[in-house]
C-alpha cells in the first residue's frame, strides 16, 4: 500500500489500480518530501464522524454507488481529509471526509444521493511526504510529525488547511 500525507500550503514504479485525475502529479516517492501543485478537481465526498480509522471502509459503498450510478470511471487516489484536525493537532481527529475524485472536473453527475456531496476544489500547493506500507494510524502520526518538522524548517511555507491522505492502492 502506498499513500501521501499532505498539507495545503500558501525511479521506483508505482502500479496503480486506476488512472490519476486529469492534470494530477504522480505520487511522491516513498520517504521523499516534495512541494507540489495540484489542478482544480471535482470529487464526490462522504462525511464521516467517529473513529476516523474506519472512515474509508464506511465511505466506500456510498461513494462507489455514486460513481456507478453516474457511469464515472474510478480514479486513484482516494482522498481523506481530517476536517477537525489542524497542522499542530496531536489528538486523533473524529471527523473525516472521504472522496472519490472524478477523472475530469467537467463531468456533471446526473444522480447525487443524499448521503454524498459533489465538491469542486480549487488548485492548491501542498507539501507532501511519500509513504509506502500499511494505512495504519501510527504510520499517519509518524509521517504527520515529519511533515510538521519540515514546515518548521521551511518558514517560507505555512499550513493553511487540514491534513489529507491520498490513498493510491
For each of these PLM feature ranges, what is it?
Residues 2-169:
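A solvent-exposed interaction/effector surface
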